[in-house]
């Protein structure tokens, strides 16, 4: 469900901000990186403790283009642990290049509290045929001013992040857990248009993400029981920058 905002532009139709997911506005989000873990065991655990959510496919394929400035300040802020901080991305699902439905997202973090503005876009023409300059100009034309300003500060496409994701939720829907694996990163720096050539794959990388209200930590532990993960920093965008050599090597996990 989205707001009834109706704005049209050449390449995109802005449907509006997703208001069906109130949990996106403010929530506590934690991540755990588990190299070479058995995805099947975690899937079985969550199928017993939670309910599976299916969005189009039982296993979603998520692809996001992250935008940053020329100095990669958003990436550096994450590496340095600076808070609050933001990330800007264009996301789509279940196709190698963008299809008819995309989401422009501004994600913010203040310590462990996070939130996300998620705007649904409908493509009026093939997005993969646009140059990045055209893509950014088209987004600027249709985005609300406060979101447009976030993109203007980050005018460079940096990394396309790709992974497979499985979704689970508590019985009441307040808590969510995702299993992310089969990660791949595509360097977008200096590219004229969206590039899916020469992926840098990390098949051993497995990420468990938990998301829910700040006051539901006990319930979250019950959802993951008997697994008691040690949560830590794990930005897929930052991992992509590190793996592609866009930032100096650093022990980031």
For each of these PLM feature ranges, what is it?
Residues 1-253:
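Phosphate-end processing signature that detects enzymes handling 5′-triphosphorylated RNA
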